[in-house]
A protein has these predicted regions:
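A short SAM/SAH-binding and catalytic strip from SAM-dependent methyltransferases
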Residues: 70-83
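A short acidic, Gly/Pro-enriched loop at the edge of an enzyme's catalytic core
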Residues: 60-71
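A short glycine-rich, Lys/Arg-flanked "PGG" loop and its adjoining helix->strand segment in the class I
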Residues: 85-100
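C-terminal alpha-helical "lid/dimerization" subdomain adjacent to the S-adenosyl-L-methionine
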Residues: 100-157, 162
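Short N-terminal helix/helix-N-cap motif within the alpha/beta-hydrolase-1
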Residues: 82-86, 111
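Class I SAM-dependent methyltransferase SAM/SAH-binding core
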Residues: 5-8, 12-61
């Protein structure tokens, strides 16, 4: 697989961004927390990672030019977006033709404490909801699957969704 330009949308401190940077051509990590962007940038310098850049930004208004990336990746980020369908549309915008999106997020659940504990705006999404977001933005070859089930309460499940521009 050729080295890709990857956008990690909702990157947090960038643990996954740093892992992807080991094989990617370039990774752009986006987060709306100035603290996370500063922390991630410091880790990048400390570890000498020169193909990873952190930027402050919102999932619904990504500071990346249109058609610039090969892969848009959102891991446990979509449930923090005020308008998740707009976040998916932004991922579409920044992708090159033929680019792909990969979303890992919580399946719909009823663990209300997540709103207070983790600032979750949404209590996950069904596979059908995520599929609608992707198809509504224009993605094709959309696939979804439950890829993880917690064995302890609150028994959260993780959905993987992919699509192609």
């Amino acid at each position: 697989m050729p080295p890709l330009v990857i956008a990690d949308l909702g990157a947090g401190e960038g643990t996954i961004s740093q892992m992807m940077a080991q094989k990617a051509k370039r990774v752009i990590a986006i987060d709306n927390s100035e603290k996370m962007v500063e922390f991630g940038s410091e880790l990048t310098k400390k570890h000498g990672i020169d193909n990873l850049e952190y930027r402050l930004g919102e999932l619904e208004d990504v500071p990346i030019r249109s058609g610039a990336v090969d892969l848009a990746f959102l891991s446990q980020a979509l449930h923090h977006a005020s308008h998740p369908e707009r976040a998916v549309a932004e991922a579409w915008r920044i992708l090159k033709p033929g680019g792909r999106i990969a979303i890992l997020d919580l399946n719909r659940h009823h663990f209300e404490q997540a709103r207070e504990l983790y600032a979750d705006l949404w209590l996950g999404f069904t596979e059908i909801e995520i599929e609608k977001f992707l198809k509504g933005a224009g993605f094709r070859n959309v696939e979804t699957a439950i890829v993880h089930r917690e064995q302890e309460a609150p028994y959260l499940e993780t959905v993987l969704a992919t699509g192609e521009k």
